[in-house]
Amino acid sequence: MSIKDRLMTYAEVLEHEPMKKHTTFKIGGCVDYYIYPKNCTALMCVLEILAQENIPYYVLGRGSNVLCSDTDFHGAIINLDRTLNDFYFEPDGVLVAQAGCSIINMAVEAMKRSLTGLEWASGIPGSIGGGLYMNAGAYKDNLANHLIDVCVLKDNTICWMKKDELDYAYRHSIFQSHKDWTILVGRFQLEKGNQNDIRDLMDSRRERRMSAQPLDKPCAGSVFRNPEEIPAWKLIEELGL
């Protein structure tokens, strides 16, 4: 049985898939296997096959903040957007979100429930898994500020890790030092707020972001880290870049 046939037992598999189809910057060569696992159990089986065949892999979110080489990647890309993309709101304002969830969709649904905490995220075109990996944020807020814990697949075992175990800082998490760990679920604590105020703030911040980073144009997203003294965007504008 071929590697593709083995993988297709547990996933949808695209061979020689152009990465430019899967990044917001619309660049990237082809990858040998682009994989959509059917569920969490299937993901574990896919990872086992890749390990047995010594196939390198990356887990990709929605392709923002990613620069892919034009050189073909002889390995696999695993995408969780199609199957691990559910989220739930508990009565006390806890949001439980799988790794493939859209950050924008989560922010909108939180607003509909008058829950505050994700207004800054209404224009960020990433997934919750990618957001937790790099601690996505904007307007002096970020995911870690609202995080309770993360469900992680590591060493073929699923476990929950509390926020204080995850070494969160500005655009940093422990996951960047453990690239063999796979983020499955995040849990966040949101608070009750005024729906009109939440909506107005989301609208203004989304409009500001879309004016600089339109979603309908090839764009890598906000890729520069902010120095402490002055925002990166201000430096770029003053330099005329």
What do the predicted segments below correspond to?
Residues 28-29, 35-40, 67-85, 133-163, ...:
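Structural signature of FAD isoalloxazine-binding scaffolds in flavoprotein oxidoreductases
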Residues 14-15, 21-23, 66, 153-241:
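Phosphate/pyrophosphate- and phosphate-bearing ligand-binding catalytic cores of soluble enzymes
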Residues 2-128:
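Anion-binding (especially nucleotide phosphate/pyrophosphate-binding) glycine-rich loop
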Residues 43-47, 107, 147, 199-202, ...:
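A generic alpha-helix structural signal
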Residues 65-66, 107-110, 118-122, 135-142, ...:
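A generic local secondary-structure boundary/capping motif
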Residues 43, 99, 103, 143, ...:
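Generic structural signal for well-ordered, non-membrane alpha-helical segments
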Residues 110, 128, 132, 136, ...:
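Short, well-ordered alpha-helical segments in soluble proteins
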Residues 36, 79, 116-129, 180-190, ...:
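Short flexible/disordered coil segments
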